[in-house]
Amino acid sequence: QETAQKISSILDEVGYIPNMGARLLSQNTSHIIGLVIGFDYLHGENAMQDPFVSTFVGQISSEIENAGYYMMIIRGDDCRKVAEVTSRWNVDGLIVLGWTEKSHKTLKKMLKKPTVAIDTYVSDPELVVNVGTDDFDGAYQLGKYWADHGFRKTLFLTENTAEMDQCRFAGFQRAMTEAFGECKKEERLILLSARKEVRRLQYDELLPRFREAGSLAFISDYLAIDAVDYFIDKGVRVPEDISITGFDDTFYAELIRPRLTTVHQNIGLKASTAMQLLLRLINREKLPEEERNIKIAVQLVVRESVRKRE
């Protein structure tokens, strides 16, 4: 023990840094966690610029480091590429953001590594452990809030029709139907382009409809804030002329004026829960069914972007 302490002290004095390649060869573990970002672009921009993605990456990197691991980012939804990189570096486990259940099925045939999915809609809990958000309840809370403020024709705006978008619309639709008797998808759901310049052209065409409805529920804070920017250019006042809400409660929601009413999801809790589950999987623990598909609770955050309808 005394000799080991002397060697350690000498290594500290000379600033010795161990070679990771040699360590990988000499051990069965790499102490590397792969973070798969399942998309290269969001809203027509680099996905890492999205406030939700960047916040999650920051939170999960802290969790990985605190657990004594290193983080390797792997981008895209190419299952073969992910399997190749993971095997080459002997990655201990994967956290995968934004993949579909189908992609996880494909990866599982190629790779047997502990994996935790983030925000995947999973029909088979044995396929992959998932940590998601209670999207339905969050949008339901928003729908009730809109109804309580007297808005009968609130429009719901999204960029695609993936499972998450469908689930959020379903929650919104349930609340509006309970309040007013109906909420037809073909009348309320508007599909926007992911490209900003095209979205601006859509807004030009939709502006009369926006004014008539007086209320817009966006699928994300990003789209809501982007719309505020457009409205400012057009002389439209928020919330006096058109009220809006977002979803996610990213830090930008408090920076804009008016401050954005939105749904808060605890991204830090999502990251810590995912890492705790992954560590248990790495340690070969079998998780009970109720811990294989966790939904993080959400909360409506009321700020300044919605007025009471007279």
Regions found by a protein language model. Name each.
Residues Q1-H31, R307:
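N-terminal helix-turn-helix DNA-binding module of bacterial transcription factors
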Residues L142-F180, E290-V306:
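An alpha-beta-alpha
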Residues D204-E310:
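Flexible loop/turn connectors
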